[in-house]
């Protein structure tokens, strides 16, 4: 009995000692709280919280800062911005999903059609003379812009020739609107000799296309359509100007000032709408 009582006493003494060491004292709690406060939530002299190296908010803030720093550099290396309409690359699950096949097939067909039209116009926009002929035939910047946007929109990723597409489009737009420099002079002038020579050198097919474009614009102008309506019909400002020249407007500026002013307003409206 004495041995049993002795063992029971030793057990209670050991248990009490373990509980005593495991229970935190008030001093240790205060010390630990101060340490955590000092490590995680320090405050500067202005009363603003200072993030620590292991703070999750600081890590996220640094990651956002790195993204904002690297993004402009990535765009500069690419030389061109991805079109906002460009479709992101489809995931494997999306490709295997039969429900997405009709849409993907439709996108492929529209992309092929846009590429087909682009190939047809390559010879028509390869140099300054070919661009001049295309303008006389009624090719407008809006037509090229639609082809460009379709290629970017229906491609599953950035087209491999994205930079060239943008460059060719910008070259055509610059040369197109450069033809109106004489229109805004006082008095307005039109370079007739250049276009008469190009017209004489055209093939019979090209001359038919040119006359068709002039007749089409003539019908719209004679009907008195507003500028908004003319823009919606994609009436070429250049063909419009050539129509006035053929009607002798620029030979008698004083008596045709209203027609010339209407053309000026339309050219500006067309350019503004194109840049939207």
UniProtKB/Swiss-Prot annotation:
This is Secreted RxLR effector protein 150. It comes from Plasmopara viticola. A motif (RxLR-dEER) lies at residues 49-64. Secreted effector that partially suppresses the host cell death induced by cell death-inducing proteins. The lineage of its organism: Eukaryota, Sar, Stramenopiles, Oomycota, Peronosporales. It is found in: Secreted; Host nucleus; Host cytoplasm. GO terms for cellular component: extracellular region; host cell cytoplasm; host cell nucleus. Residues 1-18 form the signal peptide. The RxLR-dEER motif acts to carry the protein into the host cell cytoplasm through binding to cell surface phosphatidylinositol-3-phosphate. Keywords: Host cytoplasm, Host nucleus, Secreted, Signal, Virulence.
